[in-house]
A protein has these predicted regions:
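Alpha-helical scaffold segments that flank or form the walls of functional sites
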Residues: 7, 26-78, 83-101, 122-137
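Metal-coordinating catalytic core of metallo-dependent amide/deamination hydrolases
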Residues: 79, 84-209
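Hydrophobic "anchor" residues on beta-strands that sit immediately upstream
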Residues: 11, 73, 169
Length: 210
């Protein structure tokens, strides 16, 4: 008896940002961004640079509880917490397992905070992917996360290709803003998707966000 309701398959959220869950509806006094990059650097990147592991985990609880309440049983998350990279995906996983929701996690690799943090974010992906591949519960998976073409150098692209475990795809933003395209044409002489194709990023297991 559905009691007047409709029974249907559960929803899948194919691109989520758990780290931003506590910023929904956020209004910052005196903050008037003038464009895409202003919004990224003035709000989202500022938030992710200050997240602790505990805050990341609490953000995951908030997102997953909201997902379950709205019929979402699988979440693909594209995470960033450059203030505390290592262990952040495991913190999110703990919340997912506690609530019984299926999730596929990745960390958004980016050179925007320097090459040391970029490499650390690569290793966070690699280590979590290996951990997820060894898990036989069918409730957790990993992907190679990347922020966007305009914050990823050829050096980092090469490192990702070299270290990505077999059998998984990439999860990356593509043309979220026109700046991404303009920068790619200026810096690399090609469009974003062409650059990703040349670096073997594309494929049946890769997700392109936006």
């Amino acid at each position: 008896d559905a009691k007047g309701g409709v029974i249907m398959p559960a929803f899948i959220n194919a691109h989520e940002h758990i780290y931003s869950s506590f910023a929904r509806g956020l209004s910052i006094k005196g903050y008037n961004p003038q464009g895409f990059l202003d919004i990224l650097d003035g709000q989202w990147w500022t938030i992710d640079r200050h997240l602790t592991l505990e805050q990341t985990k609490l953000s995951a609880y908030a997102t997953y509880i909201d997902s379950i309440k709205n019929g979402v049983t699988t979440v693909f998350d594209h995470h960033a917490s450059f203030g505390h990279i290592t262990g952040s995906l495991n913190a999110i996983e703990e919340a997912a397992k506690d609530l019984g929701i299926r999730t596929c996690l990745c960390y958004e690799i980016s050179d925007r905070d320097g090459m040391e943090k970029s490499r650390e974010s690569v290793m966070e992906n690699v280590n979590f992917i290996k951990h997820a591949l060894a898990d036989d519960s069918d409730m957790i998976a990993g992907m190679m996360g990347m922020h966007a073409s305009f914050t990823i150098s050829d050096e980092t692209m090469e490192l990702c290709n070299e270290l990505k475990p077999e059998g998984v795809g990439y999860h990356i933003h593509v043309a979220e803003g026109i700046y991404d395209l303009h920068q790619c044409l200026k810096e690399h002489g090609k469009r974003i998707v062409d650059r990703l194709y040349d670096w073997n990023i594309l494929g049946p297991k890769t997700l392109l966000g936006h």
